[in-house]
Amino acid sequence: EAPQNKGIDMNRCWQVGENYTRYTSDRNYNGEKGFQAYEAKALRDFLIKNKSQNGQTILVDLHGWTQQLIGDVKICSYYEKQFPENNKSGVGRYGTGYLVNWARTYLGSSAGAAKSALIELPKAGVTDHQSVVDKKFSNRYITATLDMLKSIK
């Protein structure tokens, strides 16, 4: 759906409210309107359909490789323990056009607002699949996620 067959950055096309912030650079092009990326539209519809109606909705968005923690302070604290090398300046912030910002706005329930965080994996020393295995990213991520889930009451 993008003009000139341009790809859409699905990480920045999550519209909150009536206004839409456009990014036009080749790296971050996010379309002319929210959810123009069909994958984002499908994921949005799935999340809305499956959100908690009366419990706590928690969303953790994982990608690489900008080595950051962004979003809910408590959620990020679990990942900070496993990824101490990550930049923490985005903790408590949610980004414009990000899934985690949209999620905290639209996935709440009668029990309260949704909690969300974006975990960007570290990039230092990552050159191939084996380096990701050697750095134990999967084990570290799973440990942080299980610790977070165990804390939910």
Regions found by a protein language model. Give the residues of each.
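Active-site/substrate-binding loop(s) of hydrolase catalytic cores
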Residues: E1-R93, L118-P122
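Active-site-adjacent mobile loop/cap segments within catalytic or ligand-binding domains
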Residues: L59, L69-G71, S77-K81, G95-K153
